[in-house]
Amino acid sequence: MNTPETFVYDMCHGLAKAHPELEFVEKFKIVKKVDINDDKVSLISGGGSGHEPAHAGFVGKGMLDAAVCGDVFASPSQVQVYNAIKKCATDKGVLLIIKNYSGDCMNFNNAMSDAQEDGIKVDAVYVNDDIAVKDSLYTVGRRGVAGTVLVHKCAGAAAEQGKELEEVKAVANKVIDNVRSFGFAFTSCTVPAAGHPTFEIGDDEMEFGVGIHGEPGRFREKIDYSKGTFCDDLSARIVKDLEEDLKLQKGEEVVLLINGFGGSPLQELYILNNSVTKVLDADGIKIHRTIVGNYMTSIDMAGASITVLRVDDELKKLIDYPVATPALTWGAAMGAQAEAAVEAMNAIAKALNITPGAAPAAAKKAKKASADEDDANAVYEVEGKPVIGETINTAAFVQIVEKMADVIIENEVPFCEADKMGDGDFGMSIAKGFKQLKADWATRKKGDIGQFLVSCSEIIKEYCGGASGPIWGSAFKYAGKAMLGKKEVSLTDIAFLFTEANRGVFETGKKSFGKGADIGDKTLVDALKPCAIALTKAAEEGKKLREGLDLGAKAAHEGAEATKSHVATLGRAGTVGERSIGYPDAGAHGLDVIFNELAKYIKNFK
């Protein structure tokens, strides 16, 4: 690669250049068909990058119309998803296919709400095929993994046949109800920005129930090659679990997907397929179609997942329906892929009113004109000199937020390392947003403290990766609205600011999952809410500003430390359950570091 920062951009540009029927909308990291058919339902999926070919590799005839690409292992922002919906909206509507992860659900749901308010017909389904996560303790529920590819395939075929939005959604949900997956790994994976594996595992060990973001699995055990039947024994164990969970009966038919995680050679995947097929045959389960290869990967992880989809006559026809995408092609659609490329180039030429040969130059001009318009942003200066006494004025508050951004950026790698029980991207996800905030500093409105915070929330919401975007963006937005019109804040105001920030986080979770995070759920709220409570108490007791802030920072630290003994119930760390005990929550730890650094900064401010 060139750099971790350009990893996704370079990859998507390369994909589009190899497949001229596709285009890459760089500003919003969207890979889409050049020609959107207004006579069919558009399908949009996406998520964090690092799972290629999912999801951009499945954009094409018979599957997706667009894929929204987040940073590696971080969901795309709601702004990205919203723009994908706008670009792909048709008279028949749009269906979002969402993998069941906190960040994906938050950002896709928020984008869907925005699009619906604009009058766009859009609906969604949620894929949760991973049986490794089965305990009712986990409020987010099972993860969406390789079974998502089969949802794309069947829903895509239904859309291609001209079915209505409600019918396409019903097909997608039918697949979701009948598909199950289970994964295992021999190594972890390495996120480009981190440069080291997300978890450690011995050469003689394997991880059962591993996630596609480098999350540790359900349990770990030693590999035993001594009998010479390792793959057969492994397959029998996993297939039994899949059959039981799906309640498969003798004589039923399935589609079998043997999916590599990116680091296992194709030979091993076919060996695994041989073993799995023998087990299914012995159990009287008929295989309608087998798919073997890398479809939903985890960068360079050595390992695989086994997916079974129970099929009836309807699903068999949809699975067999012709498809032409970069990563999946069969049937009459083989020729359609070249056909689609020609159609795409003609569509570009028609839209720009030029000959096909001149399209690239004209497209560059159009893109430059659009970029010039985007650059026409106003610049805002803050009035007066920064002052901190028993109140903090706007100029000083702006400096404090800038210091906060510096702390986050400086701790990008340590914050990633703290995210061992999640997917290891917390530091990268939040630092990305605050780097952008610093880059756009001059364009943030600074008329008063509330206006400034709300203005910051727009950048944070769009550029912080994964769940961090909606969570931190909401915290800033709610805090900002509470401070609108204030040009200076006291300890009492700051306590209310933190209380409202916590409410923003709670309401965001409630909107997406029906339950907002509270103390004990092992999230950043374990640090944020105690801090808000301590600040409120200090203000009520008449404490001085700096003393009150110290007490708030101390409460945040104690809350973050307490998460070591908690079982994670929300977010990606929630999927590992009791294995999260002994590790602090990454978000709570991050707030602990940030609040304590800011308390020191304010104490020493002159």
Enumerate the predicted regions with their spans:
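N-terminal loops that bind phosphate or other acidic moieties
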Residues: 1-606
